[in-house]
Amino acid sequence: KDYKKIAKTRRQRGYQWEDTLVKRFNSLEGWKAFRLGSPSVALPDVLVVNNKKSVIFTIEAKSGTGTTLFVPYDQIERCQKWTNNFEVYKMRKVILAFKFLSKKRIGTGKYERRKLHEFYKVWGNKKKAVNCVCTYNGEMYESSNGKRKELRLNDLPMPFKSKYQIITK
């Protein structure tokens, strides 16, 4: 029963993060964002367009209370497929949006306070999709057979204001 409750809490956090991103984009002139559906469907979490600026983003959104957030390669691939199909847009980007919540899990049902962090990493349209991990400090790693290999992904300054966005060097 506890596992069902934990899974539900994680899903709710994910939906809230997606909803937050949609609201932030939709509050801006010229931007339109949409949540595209459930994880079982082969769709990105969020689709964002700006027709005047000829921009399309597909976003895979991850949030949590741990020290790392994981993105499976197939979720990156489905974002790439969508982004690459909309050739009419001059700027097409796959964005991995990470939100580390202000409470850090330190045990079952135990948390401690920390600063909320947000990272928006660009996954290249032609870059091969791999399982990857983002750390609380914004470092990216490829995760393969229990081994970590550094990944260099650029940060994308968002068109909306977020006092929690951190640009890594």
Report residues per predicted region.
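Short acidic/glycine-enriched loop/turn segments that link adjacent beta-strands
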Residues: 40-43
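Short, charged, amphipathic alpha-helix that recurs within catalytic cores of restriction-modification
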Residues: 69-101, 106, 115
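Short, conserved, surface-exposed binding loops centered on an aromatic residue
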Residues: 24, 37-38, 49, 88
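Acidic-basic catalytic patches of nuclease active cores, encompassing PD-(D/E)XK
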Residues: 1-37
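Conserved catalytic cores of phosphodiester-cleaving nucleases, focusing on short active-site segments
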Residues: 25, 46-48, 54-65
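Structural signal for conserved beta-strand scaffold positions within catalytic alpha/beta enzyme cores
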Residues: 35, 60, 96-98
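Acidic-residue sensor for enzyme active/binding pockets
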Residues: 18, 60, 75
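Domain-level recognition of nuclease-like catalytic cores that cleave nucleotide substrates
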Residues: 8-12, 93-169
